[in-house]
């Protein structure tokens, strides 16, 4: 069994790298793969780069090179629910693209032609994530995570996405692409995102200020999940 763990930025995987043993590094097309062990489990930690194309490419290379048994995507996101705070974690029940529009061809908004409207996370991994969050006493919610190639800093941007997807809990830039690749490879996945900012509320300042806190909480979740897998 090989567990694939994906993060977009150095800050999102730094603590995980520190915990790995027997680590080796491989660079492919600008993506960095760190193989080794975490709690005696075989893991491949992937630094994918930011955005949907980078995430999809990196996740595909991960599958072709390492054939992961499951994928856990860690990192940060912007929160939407009023009861969520910076540092809280959102666990994906399902993931979708918020910036895809093929409605002219009778697809629902957010649906890539030929693909499902949403990508459902593996229920066992979702339940494990939720269980671990209770153990380490970090607030979490299970729900919808939306992905697009924009950092949502302005209220008018976030209002549009909220209107289209009122049940969304978090917004970020890689998860749906990772989920789509996992769907094609039939690989179980879960997305876990710690909130580094509240979308639409001075996001650029808040993101920089709280990224390390979000990264720490996300890493705690992954480390404890791997221990129980």
UniProtKB/Swiss-Prot annotation:
* Enzyme Commission no: 3.2.2.9
Positions annotated to bind substrate: 78, 152, 173-174
| Gene3D superfamilies reported for this sequence | Nucleoside phosphorylase domain
BP-aspect Gene Ontology terms: L-methionine salvage from methylthioadenosine; L-methionine salvage from S-adenosylmethionine; nucleoside catabolic process
Instruction: Give the molecular function GO annotations.
Output: adenosylhomocysteine nucleosidase activity; methylthioadenosine nucleosidase activity
Q: Which reaction does it catalyse?
A: S-adenosyl-L-homocysteine + H2O = S-(5-deoxy-D-ribos-5-yl)-L-homocysteine + adenine; S-methyl-5'-thioadenosine + H2O = 5-(methylsulfanyl)-D-ribose + adenine; 5'-deoxyadenosine + H2O = 5-deoxy-D-ribose + adenine
Question: Organism's domain of life?
Answer: Bacteria
Quick one: a GO cellular component term? cytosol
Q: Entry's CDD domains?
A: MTAN
Q: Which HAMAP family match?
A: Salvage_MtnN
* Family statement drawn from the similarity comment of this UniProt entry: Belongs to the PNP/UDP phosphorylase family. MtnN subfamily.
Q: What is this protein called?
A: 5'-methylthioadenosine/S-adenosylhomocysteine nucleosidase
